[in-house]
């Protein structure tokens, strides 16, 4: 199966190599942009496909050249050469996966599904390449005689352990099974994430009567009306399952049934026995991860994952959780007492439900401390928060931030771009911030990069770092984007 996929990839790649390169910006050796920032607005879906296939083809040739080198393995001709390989593939992946969660489209999702098995097979071609691993192992075993510096030792260690964890020391039958598991997991994990993105952005609680929204800040009511209009329910009010849309309902809405509807919709994403249901996918992922861990000699997938993390093993995680458990439960019980008290004042009998917690905790805070999240948020306008973070970074690390949104390529109108400058006035990084929810954007928050720091000879190449969140939007009327603690 793996050989068939690789052969198909190479054949298609060679066919593409005959095409004119000038129309694909990803194939250019250097981007004709400030600091070679990817020209986002010029890249098409077909450009990604061509660059990925060409990149895999090029890296395979580079790997084969390392394996077939007649000279004895050295740090330079094996470890450094491997580290330098795949530049086109890595550059393309940095842009594609940097945008696949923040600016996804049906076309990009289809391409991601198409490429997933090819990229998995390509990764296995390297990680389970016996000839390549033997050269890496020879350098690793003889490192005491090589006079390597600290960075070279670190790269050697990471490279060797990466091969071991990738299955290089398995026998042929286990390598084949590991490769099959990798491809299945790549497909399932991608499908899981795409399903979750779909349900987060396309699951709605719709309200017809504005009186049902009593308690919500006016700005959130306006946003609900705007969302309803955008999604074909003009004159009504809609909440999707992005946190900035549904959280205000759980925190401020007096209507208990509305809070229940939102809570249940959010917690039942991908659980509707339809094409986006993730239950069977989750079970398959768990089973395959366990099989892979056992194949690699680990008792559980947690043992395998934690080996390279600070915790090292599951027992240490449980020990930390056990230390936290008692004080956490005590604090939760105190909060629960506050919630019960506030519910009794509202004439509600019985134990609190999950959709009562945020609402009544906020009411308890108001009563006990004469303060509410809504009041605090007036001081947390998004641009003020950003400037506060930049001020802190300057005081702690001497970093300054200069906005360059209008000067640099943009992948979406909501994102901003910044130069990051050190105490000496040197540009040390490009920073892209992207803070508002939208269709095609994954839930949550993350830090990533379009390009890592590297050196091109003696010249340092600045990293392009991204910070992506889903914070509260401004109102349609141009009101402030107020955040909560």
Task: Label each residue range with its predicted role.
Residues 247, 439, 475-477:
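Residue-level signal for secondary-structure boundary sites
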Residues 21-217:
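N-terminal helix-rich structural modules
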Residues 155, 187, 194, 198-240, ...:
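Active-site-proximal, well-structured secondary-structure segments within enzyme catalytic domains
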Residues 32-47, 96-115, 138-180, 240-280, ...:
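Short His/Asp/Glu-rich catalytic/ion-coordination signatures at enzyme active sites or charged loops
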Residues 284, 465, 478:
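Acidic/His-rich catalytic or pseudo-catalytic neighborhoods
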Residues 474-485:
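Short pre-active-site segment immediately N-terminal to the catalytic Zn-binding motif
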Residues 267, 472-475:
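Hydrophobic alpha-helix feature that most strongly marks membrane-spanning transmembrane helices
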Residues 1-22:
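Bacterial Sec-dependent N-terminal signal peptides
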């Amino acid at each position: 199966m793996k050989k068939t996929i690789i052969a198909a990839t190479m054949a298609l790649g060679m066919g593409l190599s005959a095409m004119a390169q000038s129309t694909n910006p990803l194939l250019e050796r250097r981007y004709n942009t400030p600091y070679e920032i990817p020209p986002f607005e010029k890249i098409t879906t077909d450009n990604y496909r061509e660059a990925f296939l060409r990149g895999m083809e090029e890296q395979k040739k580079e790997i084969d050249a390392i394996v077939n080198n007649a000279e004895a393995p050295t740090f330079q001709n094996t470890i450094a050469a491997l580290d330098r390989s795949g530049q086109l593939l890595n550059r393309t992946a940095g842009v594609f996966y940097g945008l696949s969660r923040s600016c996804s489209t049906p076309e990009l999702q289809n391409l991601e599904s198409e490429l997933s098995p090819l990229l998995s097979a390509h990764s296995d071609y390297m990680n389970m390449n016996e000839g390549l691993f033997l050269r890496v192992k020879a350098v690793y075993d003889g490192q005491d005689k090589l006079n390597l510096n600290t960075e070279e030792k670190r790269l050697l260690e990471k490279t060797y352990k990466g091969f071991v964890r990738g299955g290089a020391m398995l026998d042929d039958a286990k390598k084949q099974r590991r490769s099959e598991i990798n491809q299945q997991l790549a497909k399932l994990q991608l499908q899981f994430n795409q399903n979750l993105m779909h349900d987060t952005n396309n699951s709605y609680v719709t309200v017809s009567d504005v009186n049902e929204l009593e308690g919500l800040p006016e700005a959130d009511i306006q946003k609900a009306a705007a969302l309803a209009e955008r999604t074909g329910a003009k004159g009504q009010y809609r909440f999707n399952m992005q946190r900035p849309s549904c959280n205000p309902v759980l925190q401020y809405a007096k209507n208990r049934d509305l809070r229940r509807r939102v809570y249940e919709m959010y917690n039942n994403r991908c659980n509707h026995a339809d094409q986006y249901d993730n239950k069977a996918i989750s079970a398959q992922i768990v089973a395959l991860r366990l099989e892979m861990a056992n194949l690699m000699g680990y008792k559980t997938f947690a043992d395998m994952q934690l080996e390279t993390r600070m915790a090292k093993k599951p027992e240490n995680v449980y020990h930390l959780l056990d230390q936290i458990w008692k004080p956490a439960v005590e604090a939760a019980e105190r909060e629960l007492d506050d919630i019960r008290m506030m519910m009794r004042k509202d004439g509600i009998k019985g134990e609190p439900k999950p959709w009562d917690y945020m609402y009544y905790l906020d009411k308890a805070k108001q009563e006990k401390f004469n303060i509410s999240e809504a009041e605090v948020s007036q001081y947390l306008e998004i641009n003020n928060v950003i400037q506060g973070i930049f001020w802190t970074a300057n005081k702690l690390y001497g970093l300054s931030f200069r906005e360059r949104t209008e000067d640099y390529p943009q992948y979406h109108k909501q994102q901003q771009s910044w130069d990051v400058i050190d105490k000496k006035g040197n540009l040390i990084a490009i920073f892209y911030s992207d803070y508002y929810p939208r269709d095609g954007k994954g839930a949550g928050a993350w830090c990533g990069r379009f390009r890592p720091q590297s050196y091109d000879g003696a010249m340092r190449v600045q990293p392009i770092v991204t910070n992506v969140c889903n914070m509260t939007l401004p109102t349609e009327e141009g009101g402030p984007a107020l955040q909560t603690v």
